[in-house]
């Protein structure tokens, strides 16, 4: 064999290997996560991974870093690689529509996790009942701080279904218990922002009695601000039931957290994806349980 033919053969083998490496195998499920810089979504990913291992699937995970543009690029990458099914936890319920539509055009079934997509076609959505969770949080505040309590709400990322729905449920409790809402302000599901926003709000509202934070990260940030200000008597209720959140409840720092089961959301996503790939019928929505976690 001459050198020219050998070089051609080597190039062909290399090209074949590259295509094989980039293409998705039939037994692969793709998961696009809003951010892995949040313990809740790490637990969701871990639950999905465990179920994928159990069912014999390879799970490919891409992190959108809370950036809709990065999310769209991730989905574009997956469509080029020929993914057979997409699990997506949106960065933003509205902005994710472009990514969902891209997958639709590529004939890739889409399943949303935790946060909904307002545009595009989704075969199934798996999430906790966030409206109910928001109401449970408000009801617990009323039980401990009383009717008409002076409260502050720390909101999540504007545009996410989780923030909207938790806020909706909390507003039901506000109306039922005649709370005096001193402020409702976004802190983007972030602990540092929760700390900074709470510090600013305390200056304007030193008479606050209770805080509802739409996730545990913001709750822990708010808690630190309150501790620094010498207001340990202000009750703080979080949402998600992250390991840090539940530990703070156990230690008597957080009054409560509404525990989601993110590992079950991730596991259910893979279970439903398996059914879709097998051509089985699936439900449009799958609810995942919530529980109120308080110090025992």
UniProtKB/Swiss-Prot annotation:
<dbReference type="Pfam" id="PF13407">
    <property type="entry name" value="Peripla_BP_4"/>
</dbReference>
<keyword id="KW-0813">Transport</keyword>
<keyword id="KW-0762">Sugar transport</keyword>
<dbReference type="InterPro" id="IPR025997">
    <property type="entry name" value="SBP_2_dom"/>
</dbReference>
<dbReference type="GO" id="GO:0030288">
    <property type="term" value="C:outer membrane-bounded periplasmic space"/>
</dbReference>
<feature type="signal peptide">
    <location>
        <begin position="1"/>
        <end position="25"/>
    </location>
</feature>
<keyword id="KW-0574">Periplasm</keyword>
<comment type="subunit">
    <text>The complex is composed of an ATP-binding protein (RbsA), two transmembrane proteins (RbsC) and a solute-binding protein (RbsB).</text>
</comment>
<dbReference type="GO" id="GO:0055085">
    <property type="term" value="P:transmembrane transport"/>
</dbReference>
<comment type="function">
    <text>Part of the ABC transporter complex RbsABC involved in ribose import. Binds ribose.</text>
</comment>
<dbReference type="GO" id="GO:0048029">
    <property type="term" value="F:monosaccharide binding"/>
</dbReference>
<comment type="similarity">
    <text>Belongs to the bacterial solute-binding protein 2 family.</text>
</comment>
<protein>
    <recommendedName>
        <fullName>Ribose import binding protein RbsB</fullName>
    </recommendedName>
</protein>
<keyword id="KW-0732">Signal</keyword>
<dbReference type="InterPro" id="IPR028082">
    <property type="entry name" value="Peripla_BP_I"/>
</dbReference>
């Amino acid at each position: 064999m001459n050198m020219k033919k050998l070089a051609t053969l080597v190039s062909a083998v290399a090209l074949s290997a590259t295509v094989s490496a980039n293409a998705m195998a039939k037994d692969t499920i793709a998961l696009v996560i809003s951010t892995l810089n949040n313990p809740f979504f790490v637990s969701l990913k871990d639950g999905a991974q465990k179920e994928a291992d159990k069912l014999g699937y390879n799970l490919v995970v891409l992190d959108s870093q809370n950036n809709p543009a990065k999310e769209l690029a991730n989905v574009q990458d997956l469509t080029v690689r020929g993914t057979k099914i997409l699990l997506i936890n949106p960065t933003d319920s509205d902005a994710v529509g472009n990514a969902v539509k891209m997958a639709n055009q590529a004939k890739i079934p889409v399943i949303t996790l935790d946060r909904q997509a307002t545009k595009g076609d989704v075969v199934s959505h798996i999430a906790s009942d966030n409206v109910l969770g928001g109401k449970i949080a408000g009801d617990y505040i009323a039980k401990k701080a009383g009717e008409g309590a002076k409260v502050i709400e720390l909101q999540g990322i504007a545009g996410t279904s989780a923030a909207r729905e938790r806020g909706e449920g909390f507003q039901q409790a506000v109306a039922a218990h005649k709370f005096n809402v001193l402020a409702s302000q976004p802190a983007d599901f972030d602990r540092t922002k929760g700390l900074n926003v709470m510090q600013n709000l305390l200056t304007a509202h030193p008479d606050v009695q209770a805080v509802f934070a739409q996730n545990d990260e913001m709750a822990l940030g708010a808690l630190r601000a309150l501790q620094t200000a010498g207001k340990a008597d202000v009750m703080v209720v979080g949402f998600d039931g992250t390991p840090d959140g539940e530990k703070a409840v156990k230690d008597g720092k957080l009054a409560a957290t509404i525990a989601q089961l993110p590992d079950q959301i991730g596991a259910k996503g893979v279970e439903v994806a398996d059914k879709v790939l097998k051509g089985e019928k699936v439900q449009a929505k799958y609810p995942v349980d919530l529980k109120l976690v308080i110090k025992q």
